Amino acid sequence: MPIDSDDNVFDDDDDFIELLQDSSNQTSNVTNEIATDSTNSTNTRLVVPNNRLLEEIPVPKRILLGPTHHKIDYGNLDKYVYPSNFEVRDYQFNIVQRAFYHNLLVALPTGLGKTFIASTVMLNFLRWFPESKMIFVAPTKPLVAQQIKACCSITGIPSSKVAILLDKTRKNRGEIWDEKQVFFTTPQVVENDLASGLVDPKTIALLVIDEAHRAKGNYAYNNIVKFMDRFTNSYRILALTATPASDVDGVQEIIDNLNISKVEVRSEESIDIIKYMKRKRIIRRNIYQSDEIKECIDLLCTAIAPVLKVANGKGILEITDPSRINFFQCMDASRKIVANPTIPEGTKWSNFFTLQLLGVVGQCFRRLNVYGLRSFFSYFNEKYTEFMAKHSKKKSSNKLNADFYFSEPIKQLMKRIRTMIDDPKVFSHPKIEAMMEELDEFFTINNATDSKVIIFTEFRESALEIVRFIEKVGKNLKPHIFIGQAKERDKFDESNFGKKSKGKRVGKKQQDDSKSSSENAQINGMNQKLQKEIIKNFKQGTYNILVATSIGEEGLDIGEVDLIICYDSTSSPIKNIQRMGRTGRKRDGKVVLLFSSNEESKFDKAMNGYEYIQQHIMKGQLIDLKEQNRMIPKDWEPKVEMRFIEIPEENHELQVVDDEDEIIRIATQYMMGGKSKKKKAAASKKGKTKEKRAKQFFMPDNVEIGFRSVTSMVRAVGSSKSLEEEKKEEKVRDVLDRIVDSDSDEEIPLGSIPIPRSEVIAHKQSTTDEQLLERDCQSGSNISDRTLDQHHSASEERGINSNFSHESNLPTPPENSPPKRKSIVLEEARIAKKKHKKSLGIRKPTIRPPSIIDQLKKQKSKIIRPDSANETICLDEDDILLPEYTNITEKEVTVQEDRREIEHDDDSEIFDDGLDEQLAMIDDMNTTKSFVEPTRIDFKDEVFKNDFDEHEGFLNNDELMELHTSYFTAIDPMDKVFYYDPSSSVHVDGANREYAFYGKIGHSKRSQVLIGLQKRAHEMAAKSKQSKTATPSEPETFQNYLDSDFIALQ
């Protein structure tokens, strides 16, 4: 049961401070949520340490616009049944048709047959989808009982197919969900069973929602629809309400939460329903203040004026007229002050207590103007007593409060109000006098036994005061209070203030026999059992007047009422409509509105705004509807079949029962197969013990299962790619930038560029040693001795044999194609070198004159090594001398006589498109290649003779400068080897591998011979300069030296 609105009044200072602190926390949380914003599309935003605002990537909603997954009975799909047992109303007929094709929100005034519409739709969905489930949810048990009776009585749905689920502790709920098709329950039960896996959401074809205006926030209605959306979009929703919302935003929220695709709204003035409406007379009576109320207001204004002046000076309240102080405005200003972090703590709480005192006076004005003297005295006397007790014990030191409560006007007020209350001739409020006039007139005309009256008021104290006054008058008037379950709030106890609590539990308040039933109910509250008893007595005539708070506005079948008196009014059009809708259902009714102060203007403003909203909603304006999701195939249009529904015998028992508990008991008995709960339990014990039901885990269709990284599910705000995709792209860009921007020989980690496996395999299959060799020649750089020596040592260590005279499986080259160089050692060395070098792409080369190395190599084109007779290596004339080599036949090698080394010029770093080179490589890959099998050659020892002069091969200054600038590069000091330093001589370890003491990699023997040659050449050049004239023997001596060195290389 809902709690009365009077329980929300802040009568206790501590409770009010606690609420404001909670409000402050909520406001600070809202501030923090700017960083972690929860958007309307369920995207959660988060600020990460690098100040990037991230959001969750929304999962695209699956909208099923095609055939439904529910099994359809096509034999019944060509027609839909419309009950002819009742009068056919145009608006009902039209709404039923639209409910077949849309998720529909129906807003009809009370008493116009919303339940009939729901029952007809459920009947036809049961015929069309016999294996699916239809669920009717209502917020309270009494409403569920009413809907069961109505549906079974209207449409004749067999009770054997109907289940009622009101108890979440029932153990066999899973079996009930499996066996039945139509369910009546509360939304909390459905939400719990969906989350527990007891019901498959994909089996729900129709969901009927009663009191749909509750579908806001985190209510269970919204959670059910959200859960179903995760699994399927093929379902139908029928939402019923009398008052959807008081503003456009409220209506839009319901539409969004329930996936509404069409809205059907009718008002009491709508053309198609006005002829079915009973006449309802609405009478307005404006009540003016009595002299006693005016006197109390004047005294309060005089006492609070200094406090209001202080608040105006601080700028915390704009109201300057004391009589216009409003409680809700003061409360709102207090919350803003507490939530403002820029205000110092001392100033903050000083302003807070000032506004709190002004709020107390504002509440006093409201009670005096609307409810009268007794309601005002009950409230203000408690505040006055509480302050005096705290001040006397020095628990309160607020000077502003003390000046107010100890002021002379307050003393006079307390004295005068006690005198007024004790005077029986003084009405608490003129409204009571007007109310009694209306009651006398009504019961004079109508029979006091058959006629019923409900009086609505907001506060319990006011309700009890009205009951007491009516009871004193008598005259066949039998009133009773009708309130919620909450107990009366404990008031301030002056006698126990300041004493230590013993911690004893507060027991249930005992009923006082000296007090009336209404007084005891006001103290202890009314539980559901007592509420049903009062309603039953009201229907039977034991009571003919109910004085109700908001509990009587909706959710209870109170019965037919002839007169409604609204003792006060609210600014909520929904509450006003629900109050007035309690009459004029089956016969004409009357509504009396009692207005005082500014109540009439608030009422008109609320109702006019509501009518404006209804008119625009009926025109389809101001709201955004969801897309239609059709369940019936497009080529099927069921035609109406008017049929007289025969009610099954098992449903007759429900028709004649009015008691809600009895309806629930009968429906539960049918659900359990005609057995009572005790008999069902006994039968289950005698039978075999059933296995425990395994928990089911339902998954949406085509769901992605398994683990996913968090970075794949979030993205930067404004980006369309996930963080995982951005990281991959960034990694590729970094590697490409390093390749393009680097001019050094820094190593690129292998595998740093992600390449698809298919491309790697294709590259391996198409890349040949000839292409690698050709690329290396184009690069214009010689293979370093250190690299070759390192490779050669590694090959020896792995035990690789250098005899390549075996048969090759490579394809033979085409005719007229020049033979290719087939140095396997060169190929492996160059592949290793390529892996460790970056490339700037193909650049336009510049031709460079032969270097000293080229000149030296030209002098020795063939060198025979005696111990290499078993090795055959194909070697170009221009290649660098290797540790192991042999002669090559003319068929295997074509000597390139005029080869010139290509050198990259820094002044011509212009990128070429590289098409010529790429086309040549493609041509080579597509050309069938074959190699001539190497043959053994008998070698003879012979001395190399040269014919160059003594100055050939020496560099001039320009050539030396170009050598140092073009061929030398800066190296790491740890890699530097001091060639002429005895301490850095080459050492040999146990594995016969050479290395330098200070360097990381040693030189090969051939490299050291070349270094020695260069050193001796410089010495001889120096000697020749000193002598200025060369002797004939010097060239011969130098030539002999070169011959001996080259022979040593063998």
UniProtKB/Swiss-Prot annotation:
First-level EC class: hydrolase
Principal subcellular localisation of the protein: nucleus
Ranges of Basic residues composition bias in the record: 499-508
InterPro entries in alphabetical order: FANCM/Mph1-like_ID, FANCM_DEXDc, Helicase/UvrB_N, Helicase_ATP-bd, Helicase_C-like, P-loop_NTPase
Helicase ATP-binding domain ranges (all copies): 95-262
Subcellular location: Nucleus
BP term (GO), one: interstrand cross-link repair
Region (Disordered) location: 493-524, 743-821
Composition bias, Basic and acidic residues: 786-799
GO cellular component: nucleus
Swiss-Prot/TrEMBL catalytic activity: ATP + H2O = ADP + phosphate + H(+)
Assembly and interaction partners: Interacts with the MHF histone-fold complex to form the FANCM-MHF complex.
Similarity section: Belongs to the DEAD box helicase family. DEAH subfamily. FANCM sub-subfamily.
Name of the protein in its database record: ATP-dependent DNA helicase MPH1
Organism listed in the record: Scheffersomyces stipitis (strain ATCC 58785 / CBS 6054 / NBRC 10063 / NRRL Y-11545)
Record gene name: MPH1
